[in-house]
């Protein structure tokens, strides 16, 4: 029962769109109505409001981190296995991608996945974030940074954690993230992908 409650709570937490919340707080247009239409930090940044984008980034990453850390704590206290952590990680990620509060039309999960990785292991999260930053500095393309980080995240997880269940979980999250970036992949191939800080 505790596991079911944890999974459901993680999904509801993931369903909170901080892009929409931040836009409301800073009196900005709904992030689904401009730019890429994606309720995420990169799209909010297109308004020029860096603080709103930062709130979105921290909120979306934070919910992923909280879900995993709470699952790890309960797992230790109750003697539960990695399955609980994996389930919470997937639930919060799916909540972000398919939020019940936004008619199941959510973001692409980049910040939330970063929070999940940080929750699983600090160095794992840092390594994935550094990958994103390096690619972003070179290319100035957010989606390319996210895609390369997603491709490498399962490998980082395997070598750092040495846990099959969590590696598979991160692999699933990476696959879902990549699938959410299909339009970005098409734009990258066509050389039309928008660069960071510019309107689409």
UniProtKB/Swiss-Prot annotation:
Transmembrane annotation, as ranges: 1-21, 51-71, 84-104, 116-136, 159-179
Keyword annotations: Cell inner membrane, Cell membrane, Lipid biosynthesis, Lipid metabolism, Membrane, Phospholipid biosynthesis, Phospholipid metabolism, Transferase, Transmembrane, Transmembrane helix
GO cellular component, as recorded: plasma membrane
Recorded metabolic or biological pathway in which this protein acts: Lipid metabolism; phospholipid metabolism
Catalytic activity, EC: 2.3.1.275
Signal peptide: none
Compartment annotation: Cell inner membrane
InterPro entries in alphabetical order: G3P_acylTferase_PlsY (IPR003811)
Catalytic activity: an acyl phosphate + sn-glycerol 3-phosphate = a 1-acyl-sn-glycero-3-phosphate + phosphate
Biological process according to GO: phospholipid biosynthetic process
Membrane topology of the entry: Multi-pass membrane protein
Family: Belongs to the PlsY family.
Job of this protein: Catalyzes the transfer of an acyl group from acyl-phosphate (acyl-PO(4)) to glycerol-3-phosphate (G3P) to form lysophosphatidic acid (LPA). This enzyme utilizes acyl-phosphate as fatty acyl donor, but not acyl-CoA or acyl-ACP.
Subunit structure: Probably interacts with PlsX.
Matches recorded under NCBIfam families: glycerol-3-phosphate 1-O-acyltransferase PlsY
Name this polypeptide is given: Glycerol-3-phosphate acyltransferase
Gene name tied to this protein: plsY
């Amino acid at each position: 029962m505790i596991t079911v409650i944890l999974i459901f709570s993680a999904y509801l937490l993931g369903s909170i769109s901080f892009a929409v919340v931040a836009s409301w707080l800073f009196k900005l247009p709904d992030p689904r109505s401009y730019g890429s239409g994606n309720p995420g930090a990169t799209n909010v940044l297109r308004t020029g409001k860096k603080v709103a984008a930062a709130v979105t980034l921290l909120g979306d990453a934070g919910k992923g981190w909280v879900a995993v850390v709470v699952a790890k704590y309960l797992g230790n206290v109750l003697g539960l296995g990695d399955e609980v952590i994996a389930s919470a990680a997937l639930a919060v990620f799916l909540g972000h991608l398919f939020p019940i509060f936004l008619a199941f039309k959510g973001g692409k999960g980049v910040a939330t996945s970063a929070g999940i990785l940080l929750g699983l292991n600090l160095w794992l999260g840092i390594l994935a974030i550094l990958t994103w930053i390096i690619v972003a500095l070179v290319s100035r393309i957010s989606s390319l940074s996210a895609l390369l980080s997603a491709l490498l995240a399962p490998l980082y997880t395997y070598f750092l954690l040495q846990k099959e269940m969590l590696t598979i979980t991160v692999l699933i999250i990476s696959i879902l993230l990549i699938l959410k970036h299909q339009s970005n992949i098409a734009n990258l191939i066509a050389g039309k992908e928008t660069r960071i800080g510019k309107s689409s």
